[in-house]
Structure formats: C-alpha cells, structure tokens
Amino acid sequence: MFAKRFKTSLLPLFAGFLLLFHLVLAGPAAASAETANKSNELTAPSIKSGTILHAWNWSFNTLKHNMKDIHDAGYTAIQTSPINQVKEGNQGDKSMSNWYWLYQPTSYQIGNRYLGTEQEFKEMCAAAEEYGIKVIVDAVINHTTSDYAAISNEVKSIPNWTHGNTQIKNWSDRWDVTQNSLLGLYDWNTQNTQVQSYLKRFLDRALNDGADGFRFDAAKHIELPDDGSYGSQFWPNITNTSAEFQYGEILQDSASRDAAYANYMDVTASNYGHSIRSALKNRNLGVSNISHYASDVSADKLVTWVESHDTYANDDEESTWMSDDDIRLGWAVIASRSGSTPLFFSRPEGGGNGVRFPGKSQIGDRGSALFEDQAITAVNRFHNVMAGQPEELSNPNGNNQIFMNQRGSHGVVLANAGSSSVSINTATKLPDGRYDNKAGAGSFQVNDGKLTGTINARSVAVLYPDDIAKAPHVFLENYKTGVTHSFNDQLTITLRADANTTKAVYQINNGPETAFKDGDQFTIGKGDPFGKTYTIMLKGTNSDGVTRTEKYSFVKRDPASAKTIGYQNPNHWSQVNAYIYKHDGSRVIELTGSWPGKPMTKNADGIYTLTLPADTDTTNAKVIFNNGSAQVPGQNQPGFDYVLNGLYNDSGLSGSLPH
C-alpha cells in the first residue's frame, strides 16, 4: 500500500505501522522438460522456485520491449503495477511522485493512463510467454479510490458494495483493521458475495489475458473465514483460480495473522526485509541475525525482499538511503537462499542514496539498470541452478562482515559488507579447481576442501562450475536432500525438471524407473506400515547426454512415537536448552515449559538431543536453542520450524538425526 499525500491524523500511525519490527499454488508450472521456447537455465521451473522482478511503474510496452533483458538477467517472473482503471490525480501527471494513484481503483476494467491499454497488456503477456517469463499482477481488491465521485457506476451499482471510509483507529484490533478504511479509501464489503464475484471476474479476465498470478495489495485488511462474526469466504473464493502463484501483502504486526493467511496464499516477510536492511546499515551480516525469516510461516510460503515499493517510495523513506552496493549485498543474501521466493524492487532511474524521485524518468519508463547488473544477474542465475540444494550460512573466520552461503557441493555465494577487501580461507564442499567470480572481478581456488581467494570491498562473489548452468536439473519441490523427511499418513510429492532436462526419471526404493515431466506428482505411504523408509532417486539427462542425480529420503512415522530433535552446538555452549513452543491464535503454548525450556542431553557423537512425549502435538511448533542467555535464532526472532528427527545448526535445519 501507500501513505503518500494522505495528510490525515492517521498518517503518522500508518507510517509507524509500516515500520514495525515486528498460497494458493494452483497447479504445477505448465512448462515441461520438452517445452521449446526461449527459456533456458536462466529461468527457474516455477515462479515459486525463481526470482521476481517488481517492474514498478513500468508500462506494458516498456515491459514488452525489455523482456529479453529481463529473461537474460535470470528472472522467472515479473510483477506489474496495478493494471485496472484508477483515479487520474493531479491532472494525470506521470511524475514518479504520483505513483500512489495507481492504488486508487475506480473500476476493474483492465487498462489505465499510466501503464497502457488492455490490448497492450495482452501483447506484453505474449512477449513474456515467448521468453518463459511469468506475469504477476498487483491486484488492489481491498479498496477503491477515496474520491467517491470518481468511482465508476459499475462499482456503485453493486448493492451494499462498501464498508464506507471510516478510518482505522486501532491497528491491534482485527475488526478495525479489516472492516474499516485504510487512509480514507472506500473499503470493499468483502463479505458481500456480489462483490466477491465482481472482483473475481477481474482476476479471471487478467488470467485469460495472459497473467500467471497475483500480488494481493493490503491483503491483511480483508478478513479471514475464522475472524469471528465478521469472517467471510472471500479468500477461499478469490484464490480459487487457475493462477500458478498468489501472494498477499501482509505487513507483520500483532494483528496480521500471517500463518492464517498462508493457508490461502504465500505471504510477505516484511520483518525479514527490516532485518536485512538493519544488517546492511550496520554492515554486520552475522548469520545469527539474518538466517531466520522472522516469521511463523515456513520459508517456502514467503516472498522476501531487500526493500519494497512502500519502504522506498512512502514519505518516511525507510529504505531510500540504500545505495546500489547495499542492494547488491542484500540481494546476495536473500536470493542465494533456498526456500523463499525473492522479489527485486526496480527503483526509478537515478534513485537511492536518499533521493526518491530524481526526475530522470516518469511513470511508464524502465527503472534503473540495477535489475540487470552483473552481480544481480549472477545471483539470480545461482538461485535458479541451485534449486533443491541445501543451504549452509556462515561467517568465514568469524568475520560478521563476510556472508557465505554454501548450497550443497554445487555453489557458493559470498558478500563483503566491509570497506576493505578480505582474504578468504575457509572450508568448502566445492570440487577442487579454479572458480571465476560470476558476479564481478577476481577468481577463487579450491584445493582439498579449502576455498581461498580475495573478495573486494562492498562486493559479491558467485562461484559454481560452468557445467552446472547447462546441466540437467531435477528435484522434488519443497524438499531437501541430505535430510530424512517424516510424514504420518500419505504424502503427495511434486517432481521438477528444468528446461535443460530432456529426459527425467525417478525410482522409489530401487524400483523400476518411471519417466516424468516437470510438475508431475506421485504419492507414497498409502497403506504402508509405520517405520517404512523411502529412498527416492531422480535422474535428469540433457541433450548432450550429461546426467545428474538427486537422492531424497522419507520415513512414515507413527504420530504416537517419541519426538526427538538434535542440535550440533557449533558455539560449544556448556549448557544447551531447547525452548519449543507454538501459537494458538494470540496464545503461546510452551511445549517445554517456560524459558529457557528443557536441557538437552549430549550424546557420544557430540550431538545434543531432546525427546518430547509421544503424545505431544508439535504441529506448527518452533524451537529456539539457547544456553540461558545467548540463543539461536537471535533475540526477537521466531524459532526454527520444528521437524521431527531434525538435526539443527545455527542456520536452521541441517539434516536428520542418525538412526
């Protein structure tokens, strides 16, 4: 949402709210291993597993003419600004400072003065499809414009269409937040089924025109089905479309109910963005502060960013201070990681370093060239080719200005937040050899498990063998290798194969090979006894005959069996406790008693373990490891997701406990 120009008594509260510290994924991707278009290893198999370019204020024609550059920069999807009819404020002036009018709908016909016509939208979507790029539309369906006279008759003809424009007063009150008006904008009566049908027709039309998904603006201001007497079926209805990817803008606070919204869509990790910006400002990339996503929602349902259009363009200018170097470093952190879907915000030409709107461009123009910068592009490509690989975050030699993310044995990203170059000499799983930095100048060497080289000041290094980018890539969606995943009844798994893969097969427990295409699914566990294990092997082959294999492990566990987790204690604490808890609405249930939880037991292999009673309900539980004072994750951050039989280090889940 936005705060620009609304000089009301509520604005300071709303601006402060934006600064608080505190999916429906409908079907698999359409592309298969046999798909023939201009997509290649630069584009991930699905929106969820790729990166998104937020083409803020770019017109449809601008997007169409830059689609090849977007593709070559490694993005899997673009996110548009709102595409429907909006109020043309300030005589329709297209100066960047007038961006907020795009968030004041007057009707839900597609096309507006700022971005272009519906036909131009269709042509842009067709160009995106040619390059294997997916299109996400920013859908403003919580409210209309604040100018009642400007609202179209087709909206006003819907009986009882609005809650009115009485402004929100208590931002901790769910009823107030969802049933009253954001900044005086007329609030849709989202309980009204005629309103739901009207808005859904707009979404369906956008999909028919070529869109692939949606960002739902101000999503937390629309009630959920279980929001008491004012709850509605709005979200179950609205998200029941053919969209591949849908996520909601859920700016986190005490009333945001992030995890509940995640039952219907992916959600934004706004607190994590604040953690990243704080780390950049302090030039401290300590993994204890930036490893956790600061959300009770699992990483695979999060959209992450270094900054958003709100943090950049609102009057409080929360992130406008950042330089291009800051954004490169932040992007190296969030987009090198597994799990979440990173969103890159395209600033206006010349923006940043404290200047929001330098006047070098207007609404409709392309943003700054940073979106296709060498380092940004290298990290995007790294993100794509590392899909399915585990992550290991660290600060080499204890230097908190150096961030390192090692993705299995396939690749490494380094970021140096400091003002001086730093010599790297650290353990790695990369194969021996020389690695040229794909993000900039310099090269690194690996010998006998040691990575050595120099990373320049305020820079990024992206390292992986050249053949990985062209290699076939097959993986199981949302599951890691090197970890034994548990389930209780039966489990349906989605298979993925990238555009390099011309042939893909899987095996279960050394059984017959079964061919698959990207997005195919299979089920394990039905009717099988508890304790049965499953080894799933994937093999992909490219057009040159190069093959790659991946191995995954699963076990069907009795939900009544003992629940054990382990911690590797990399900090060598003399006392290790596990504090395990979960949320029931606003109530915290402490599964290991009050802080600091229960002591863990050191085993002969040096791993600390804790076993909970078999009847403990650990659904959606979190765990924090601590020694009574220091803790992992860091203070004021939610715990790691509790995974039965999981083995943890300071970056989170690292594997499974030995049998």
From Swiss-Prot:
Belongs to the glycosyl hydrolase 13 family. It comes from Bacillus subtilis (strain 168). GO terms for biological process: carbohydrate metabolic process. Ca(2+) 2 binds at residues 210, 212. One of its GO terms (molecular function) is metal ion binding. Residues 1-27 form the signal peptide. This is Alpha-amylase. GO terms for cellular component: extracellular region. Its main location: secreted. It comes from the Bacteria. SUPFAM superfamilies: (Trans)glycosidases (SSF51445), Glycosyl hydrolase domain (SSF51011). The active site is at 217 (nucleophile), 249 (proton donor). Monomer. It is an enzyme of class 3 (hydrolase). InterPro entries: A-amylase/branching_C (IPR006048), A-amylase_C (IPR031319), Alpha_amylase (IPR006046), CBM26 (IPR031965), Glyco_hydro_13_cat_dom (IPR006047), Glyco_hydro_b (IPR013780), Glycoside_hydrolase_SF (IPR017853), Ig-like_fold (IPR013783). Ca(2+) 1 binds at residues 142, 178, 187, 221. It catalyses: Endohydrolysis of (1->4)-alpha-D-glucosidic linkages in polysaccharides containing three or more (1->4)-alpha-linked D-glucose units. Its EC number is 3.2.1.1. It is found in: Secreted.
